[in-house]
Amino acid sequence: MKDLKQCRIEIDAIDQQLMELFEKRMALSKSVVEYKIDHYLEIIQPEREREVIEKNLNRLNNDQLKEYARCFIQEMMTVSKSYQSDLLPLELDKNIKTDFKKDPVVGYQGIAGAFSQSAVENFFGEGTKNIGYRDFEDVYVALENGEIDYGVLPIENSLTGSINDNYDLIRKYGFYIVGETAVNVSQCLMALPGTKIEDIRQVYSHPQGLAQSSEFLYQHRYIEQRPFQDTAMAAKYVMDSKDSTKAAIASPLACKLYGLEMLKENVQNKKNNRTRFMVISKELICPKESDKVSVIFTLPHQVGTLDNMLQTIKQSQINMDRIESRPIETQYWQYYFYIDFEGNMHEERIQRAINKMKANSTTLKVLGNYKRA
């Protein structure tokens, strides 16, 4: 058995060699990233990383050290990518827009009286020209075709969580988030004038409206729930039906607009019910007072990649507000990740943090930088 002092002397000598090799390796990493920048190549290349790991593991003489060696190599590459990310140019275009178009046309899902219409007025002001569309995707198509300048769509409810369709659609169409607003949601039961609750056999509302009112509906289980495209559309449908066995769950404004009678206010499960809406645009707009960044990214399908990304965010000292995952349709059990964090893209530290995130992801896109609601 070797003497402890002698072991430490030999370890110190090896560490010295490692530091010399470390400096050489990092110098080569710098050359690699400079080449990739000049030739417009992706910084992260999962196939190359797998090749490096396997090639080095095959060089081991002691198979019992294989998993330790794997961790060592992966950590070495993580450090290399972090260094490379610091060498990337900062990408914010100084000519990027900071102001919205004057007198815009804004699209939303639903009809007059919808919560989405209230969100339009909250963000752009009363009197803004707005157009309602039947489905969420119709708003994206209208924006794509130039029928509208911006769209306002729900992204999250404080009770029922994310509206996943809009996470998927903003990725599908490649649009940007340029703002957000929140609307207090008061779900109300309404029907034709003179109707009593015990007369009702069907209730119509958007699936979110039904979900948010689940406790009330459980108490009235004899009423059949009928999902509808929109809460305000449901109110209009009930009025047009002239059927006193039908009711809608919608906003007080919809009740007033469509001449229905309010049977019960605030039937939602919790009174503090709010929906957050995003404002979408075909082009990126970063108002100077922005304090929230949204990004979407994918990761190599390897152990520890999500943890590495979260560590990158932590080490960059940025406060993450939210993380959401959505399946990649063409790849089993792999995901798109959406995160929101505090910051302004005009700050150098935020741009450098995003560069580090890019170095740890397969793909990454900034969805927007805007003022939080």
What kind of region is each of these model predictions?
Residues 1-373:
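Domain-level signature for soluble enzymes in the chorismate/prephenate branch of the shikimate pathway
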